[in-house]
């Protein structure tokens, strides 16, 4: 239990003794206020039981038993302010490993889900990075996480790319990345003024896709796309194919479940006559038209109905698909796929989630809300609450809108190549010796890919991003290189200490010698579990990215601090014996905090910068 949690428990215990139970909030005190932590608990107690808040605060201050690490408590009006014991607090931070409050249950995260007709472009990377980071955060929180990638193998985009290959007599040379080659045909077809006359040929390909005749070609595209995602650090557990979802009868099973709801009907007159409709007014208030058509009067299912069936399956409301191994990821883990010739999921290995997160762009806000509402219509209120749409806004590149159909895009592979190239150029400009190292390419890879991931994560998902190279790779500002540089700086201090023979594990540390400036840094380190728990709770990795920036800024402020005489205030290796060892142990913990934080968002720390 961290110190804030201990303080909360101590205040609540004291309030209980006073006969005024309270759910105490523990907050950091503002910079211009006394103390390190505070609570307005006396306000709540006075409101519930009557009495003067200031008097209750004074009594509470006398009653509360302070946990180790808290030096004293003061009642300031109706507030309680707690003052930390710097040495005890820092030691507690150093000796306590990063650990999140454990959450149980399985979470299914669907992300990527790019049409299998061309390569990923830079705009797709936001989806991949958001989904992969959420998987990392939720695993750290203790959840079992299953990452799914939905493959629309029967859609028009896949058909157009395959048709273009046939129509233009295009031949793959085996050298160019397959998905990039396939995408060139897609762009060519959509620029062809004769395209309307080619509709019958495109439809013929679509029918073959629906029959599964061209699946090996689509699989080849998917494997090429996955190589792009692997390179960015993303990993997957299961690929679900549209043709298998349709062929497994999910639609019929879902409609059977919804048939029994008082919110569904089959009108016999009016504009919905003969259709199967769902009234979502209780679940989506404010709609002009609360009725959603699931199946048209002619028997054709709307796409929303298919999505509902798929979501019901993810939550384990029914079975149906078969599975088999598809390929291995770079670590040798098996990626599974749905397949007509696979085996039934008798062990309930896939789906059966307690929570489902769909990472899909903001254009799908309304359809995803309909899918969520369908769970409520089916009487599955708990599942409705845990059906999450992680919505995100579009990405532009250097101010330019991306369009894969028109070929106005930079491929994700090219973007990663460019990031590494530019990172190496930055290294050469800063430190030519560093750029000449044998591992310079690996250093540049970590900086470049880190810059891309961070740029896609640092803002709230609903905010638009304009990705700009110069900003993303800057060593100053809200960038991955800024955080990575701070982490490397911490490692360099430890390396010099070890070369000098100084202990870095706390042996010989004089914790009481630590001044408040070290306490400020330790308080920032101690926030990590709370930040990660918040990211898991609100389903957004951006708070972890922002914390990484705060951690780097706090360390840089500590590192560059000066005494009143203008001399370095925190030169670790020149600190007095005892203080030096305490500070080195703190830097070890800081470095681990950088590693843990960046790992949550899939960013690696380079060996040098």
Swiss-Prot record:
Main EC class the enzyme belongs to: ligase
Entry GO CC: cytoplasm
The entry's keywords: Aminoacyl-tRNA synthetase, ATP-binding, Cytoplasm, Ligase, Nucleotide-binding, Protein biosynthesis
Reactions catalysed, as given in the entry: tRNA(Arg) + L-arginine + ATP = L-arginyl-tRNA(Arg) + AMP + diphosphate
Primary location: cytoplasm
EC number: 6.1.1.19
Molecular function terms from GO: arginine-tRNA ligase activity; ATP binding
Gene Ontology terms: biological process: arginyl-tRNA aminoacylation
InterPro entries: aa-tRNA-synth_I_CS (IPR001412), Arg-tRNA-ligase (IPR001278), Arg-tRNA-synth_N (IPR005148), Arg-tRNA-synth_N_sf (IPR036695), ArgRS_core (IPR035684), DALR_anticod-bd (IPR008909), Rossmann-like_a/b/a_fold (IPR014729), tRNAsynth_Ia_anticodon-bd (IPR009080)
Alphabetized Pfam families for the sequence: Arg_tRNA_synt_N (PF03485), DALR_1 (PF05746), tRNA-synt_1d (PF00750)
Annotated compartments: Cytoplasm
Ranges spanned by the short sequence motif 'HIGH' region, renumbered to the chain: 114-124
SUBUNIT field: Monomer.
Family: Belongs to the class-I aminoacyl-tRNA synthetase family.
Name this protein carries in UniProt: Arginine--tRNA ligase
Species this chain originates from: Deinococcus radiodurans (strain ATCC 13939 / DSM 20539 / JCM 16871 / CCUG 27074 / LMG 4051 / NBRC 15346 / NCIMB 9279 / VKM B-1422 / R1)
Gene: argS
């Amino acid at each position: 239990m961290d110190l804030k949690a201990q303080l909360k428990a101590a205040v609540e215990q004291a309030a209980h003794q006073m006969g005024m139970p309270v759910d105490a909030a523990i907050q950091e005190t503002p910079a211009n206020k006394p103390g390190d932590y505070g609570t307005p608990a006396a306000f709540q107690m006075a409101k519930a039981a009557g009495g003067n808040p200031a008097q209750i605060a004074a009594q509470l201050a006398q009653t509360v038993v302070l946990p180790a690490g808290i030096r004293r408590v003061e009642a300031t009006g109706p507030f309680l302010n707690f003052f930390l014991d710097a040495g005890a607090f820092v030691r507690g931070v150093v000796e306590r490993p990063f650990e999140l409050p454990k959450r149980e249950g399985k979470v299914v995260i669907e992300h990527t889900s790019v049409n299998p007709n061309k390569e990923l472009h830079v705009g797709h990377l936001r989806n991949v990075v958001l989904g992969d980071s959420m998987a990392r955060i939720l695993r750290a929180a203790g959840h079992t996480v299953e990452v799914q990638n939905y493959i629309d193998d029967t859609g028009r985009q896949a058909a157009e790319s395959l048709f273009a290959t046939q129509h233009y007599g295009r031949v793959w040379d085996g050298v160019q990345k397959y998905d990039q080659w396939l995408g060139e045909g897609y762009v060519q077809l959509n620029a062809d003024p004769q395209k309307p006359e080619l509709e019958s040929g495109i439809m013929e390909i679509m029918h073959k896709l629906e029959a599964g005749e061209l699946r090996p070609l689509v699989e080849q595209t998917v494997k090429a796309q996955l190589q792009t995602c692997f390179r960015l650090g993303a990993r997957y557990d299961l690929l679900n194919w549209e043709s298998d979802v349709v062929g497994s009868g999910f639609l019929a099973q879902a409609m059977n479940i919804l048939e029994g709801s008082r919110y569904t009907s089959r009108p016999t007159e009016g504009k919905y006559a003969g259709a199967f409709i769902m009234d979502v007014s209780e679940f989506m208030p404010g709609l002009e038209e609360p009725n959603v058509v699931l199946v048209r009067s002619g028997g054709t299912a709307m796409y929303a109905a298919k999505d509902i069936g798929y979501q019901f399956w993810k939550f384990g409301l029914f079975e149906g698909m078969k599975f088999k191994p598809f390929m291995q990821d770079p670590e040798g883990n098996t990626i599974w796929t749905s397949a007509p010739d696979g085996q039934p999921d008798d062990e309930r290995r896939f789906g059966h989630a307690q929570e489902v997160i769909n990472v899909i762009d903001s254009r799908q806000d309304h359809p995803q809300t309909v899918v969520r509402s369908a769970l409520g219509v089916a009487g599955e209120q708990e599942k409705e609450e845990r059906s999450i749409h992680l919505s995100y806004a579009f990405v532009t590149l250097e101010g330019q809108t991306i369009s894969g159909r028109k070929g106005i895009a930079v491929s994700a592979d090219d973007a990663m190549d460019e990031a590494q190239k530019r990172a190496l150029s930055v290294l050469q400009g800063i430190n030519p010796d560093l750029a000449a190292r044998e591992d310079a390419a690996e250093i540049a890879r970590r900086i470049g890919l880190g810059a891309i991931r961070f740029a896609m994560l640092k803002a709230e998902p609903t905010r638009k991003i304009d990705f700009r190279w110069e900003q993303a790779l800057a060593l100053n500002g809200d960038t991955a290189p800024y955080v990575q540089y701070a982490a490397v700086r911490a490692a360099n201090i430890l390396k010099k200490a070890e070369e000098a023979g100084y202990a870095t594990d706390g042996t010989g540390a004089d914790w009481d010698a630590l001044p408040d400036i070290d306490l400020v840094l330790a308080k920032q380190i101690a926030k990590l579990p709370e930040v990660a728990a918040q990211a898991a709770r609100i389903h957004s990795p951006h708070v972890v990215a922002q914390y990484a920036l705060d951690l780097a800024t706090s360390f840089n402020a500590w590192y560059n601090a000066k005494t009143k005489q203008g001399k370095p205030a925190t030169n670790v290796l020149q600190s007095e014996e005892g203080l030096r060892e305490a500070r080195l142990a703190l830097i070890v913990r800081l470095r681990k905090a950088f590693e843990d934080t960046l790992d949550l968002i899939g960013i690696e720390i380079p060996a040098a910068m």
